[in-house]
Amino acid sequence: LTQREGMNYYSDKDIRKWESLYTGRTTYSGQISGVHTLRENVNKVDWTVGYAFASYREPDRKIVNSILDENRTEQPNYYVSDPMRYYQELKDHSASLAANYEHKFTVSDRFAPVLNGGVYGEYKSRTFAARRFGYNLLGSGYDRYADWDYTELFADENISADKIWMRETTTNSDSYTSENMLGAAYVSAKLNYGEVLNANIGVRMEYYQLKMDGYSSDGTTPVHLDNKTTDFFPSVNVAYNLSQKHLVRAAYGRSVNRPEFREVVPYLSLIHI
C-alpha cells in the first residue's frame, strides 16, 4: 500500500495518489556442463546447456487519484478522480547451448601455440499481457469524498448503475510477444613465444534475429518487427616484453550492444518496465 501527497504544478492543484498492489515473481536458472579430455595435455572439449525462466505478475493493482476541493470546508475535502484497476503478467523463457574445443601444439620449448574454437546458441522468448479497467463515479449512490481509505470503492456491491460504472479500457497495445535467437561461432589462437611475446588473435561470427509482434501506442496499428543481422567481431591482443618491468601492448576488439525486449516495444509503459 502506497500513499502519496503533493502538488501538481501543471494544474496548480493539491493531489493525492493511493495505490494498492500485490506482486509475484518466479525465477529459475539451471545449467548442466561437462569437460571431456580427448588426449591428455593436447586437446579437450567442454560444453554447457542452460535454461532459465522468469515471470512477474500483478494480479490486482488498484490506483486512485484524488484532488483537493478548495471550495469544501468540511472533511474529507479530497474528491476521487480517475480510479483504475490493472492486471498484468509477464513470462520469459531462455535456453542456451555452448561447446568449446581446445588443441595444444608443441613446436619447440619456447613456442607452444594453442588453438580454440567453439559454438554458442541462445533462444529467448517473452509474452506480456495486461488488462485495464476504469471506474466512473457518475452515480448518486456513492460519496466521491474519502480520506485515504479507498478499499470500499472497489467493493462489488458498489458496482451498479446508480453508484459506480466499471468500464474496460484495455487496448491492443497492452500486450505483445517477442523472441530472439543468437547463433555464434568463434576461432582463436594463443601464440606465445617464451616470455618475450604474448599474442592472442581471433574472430567471432554472430547471427542474430529479433522478432516482435504488438500494436502502436493507440492500439490501432499492428507492429511486426523481424530484424536479422550477421556480424563479425575480430580481436587482437599483442604484448612484447622489453624487460621484466616494461612491455609494449597493442590491442583491438569490436563488440555490439543489442536492445532488450522492452526497448523495442512501440509504446512506453512505466508500469511494466
Q: Which positions does each model-derived feature cover?
A:
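Structural signature of Gram-negative outer-membrane beta-barrels, strongest in the C-terminal barrel
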Residues: Y22-S33, G50, Q88-N100, K104-K163, ...
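Accessible peptide chain termini
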Residues: L1-T2, L270-I273
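Outer-membrane beta-barrel domain signature, strongest for Gram-negative TonB-dependent receptors
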Residues: L1-V114
